[in-house]
Amino acid sequence: MPGIPLGGKRYFLAKTDPETYSIEQLEREKQTVWDGVRNPQALKTIREMKPGDCVFIYHSMGDPAVVGVAEVSSPGRPDPKDAKLAVADFRFLCRINPPVTLKEIKASGNFDDWALIRQSRLSTMPAPEAFVEWLRRERPHCRF
């Protein structure tokens, strides 16, 4: 399922272990190369990313949660270290405070078919339009 176009943008979710790379680091650095993805399905998602698409940054450890939003600033492309892999550049947009926890997402009852719930090991995935709309209602302070 490709990222859902909503107002011309597509939306994705990318997971990270905050001990490896956190939203705080992305905010400080302003931009990063998103790499380290190995799963074939997640690599396909990275390759589909285009400049202007939005990516929800999800901390996968501790209390799992969507913690921020980034914008894709370069298209998905082969990883220069390993052409079988793919990378994309992300630019920090905003933090989501309070973070949207996995418990909160599950409790909404709206996203049982989303890969975030069904395929918990998948590191990068499209975000459904319903999630984007729900998040805009739940956290209106973060504009994306």
Could you tell me what each predicted segment is?
Residues 19-21, 97, 132-134:
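Short, acidic Gly/Pro/Ser/Thr-rich loop/turn segments
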Residues 127-144:
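Charged phosphate-binding loop/patch that engages nucleotide di/tri-phosphates or the phosphate backbone
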Residues 14, 51-55, 122-124:
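Hydrophobic/aromatic beta-strand segments within beta-rich folds
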Residues 56-57, 71:
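Hydrophobic beta-strand signal
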Residues 66-125, 129:
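Aromatic- and Lys/Arg-enriched surface recognition patch
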Residues 10, 30, 51-53, 66-68, ...:
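A generic structural signal for short beta-strands and their flanking turns/coil linkers
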Residues 1-51, 139-144:
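Compositionally biased, charged N-terminal/linker segments
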Residues 58-64:
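Short, charged beta-turn/beta-strand-edge "cap" motif at the junction between a beta-strand
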